[in-house]
Amino acid sequence: LAVYAAAMNFSIFDISLVTFMLAISGAISQYPVGYISDKFDRRKVIIYSTFGAAIFAFFAIFSVGTMYLPDGLGSSKFWFYIFLIAFSVCSLPMFSLILAHTNDFITRDKFVAAGASLQFAFGLGAISGPFLCSLLMDLIGNNGFFVFLIIFHCLIGVFAVYRMKIRPSEENPDSQFVAVPTTITPVGMELNPTTEPIEEPEKI
């Protein structure tokens, strides 16, 4: 992002500002996006987030293009900052969403291995992404930065739609939740065959 901002003739202050806004908005968005993903199907949240990020990246391209129009016609950087923040809110929680979705389909003893594998894949993307993005920027211009992000997020969104069609949502295999009335007694809980036995305290 800093390289893109420098190529677009942003000042040093503007470059530091967009970098700060991208990081802080992405960090804050972890909480509301995580809460929403706990209430609804995570794959739907991933789909909305990826396509939302792609849409806001497109708007960012448009807003940057209007900033360099003649006086009286051009827009300020305000809208670019707004679209950048909206993009960050949709994009940066993606790793957490995918990790949480993965944990929904595996047992608890595989959480660490799954997290390590996803972190490795994330690292490969962090290494190859800037290189591939720079090639696209050299090919089509500075806006290749956001074009690359649009393509990348759309691919994730399309894959999520594909997975939703071939695999239904299921509960966590470690979950032992059973819906019971509020008036149930402790005896009713003990009669549930899926409830783990509770050890009686030793008498002194």
Named regions from a protein language model:
Residues 52-73:
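C-terminal ends and interior cores of transmembrane alpha-helices
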Residues 12-13, 106-118:
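Loop-to-transmembrane helix entry/capping segments in MFS-fold secondary transporters
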Residues 1-14:
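Short amphipathic helix-loop junctions that connect adjacent transmembrane helices
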Residues 92-106:
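Intracellular juxtamembrane helix-capping segments at the cytosolic ends
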Residues 163-204:
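Intrinsic disorder in cytosolic terminal tails and internal cytosolic loops
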Residues 44-59, 150:
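Structural signature of the two symmetry-related core transmembrane helices
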Residues 135-153:
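A membrane-interface helix-boundary motif in multi-pass transporters
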Residues 29-41, 137-138:
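Helix-to-loop junctions at the C-terminal end of transmembrane segments
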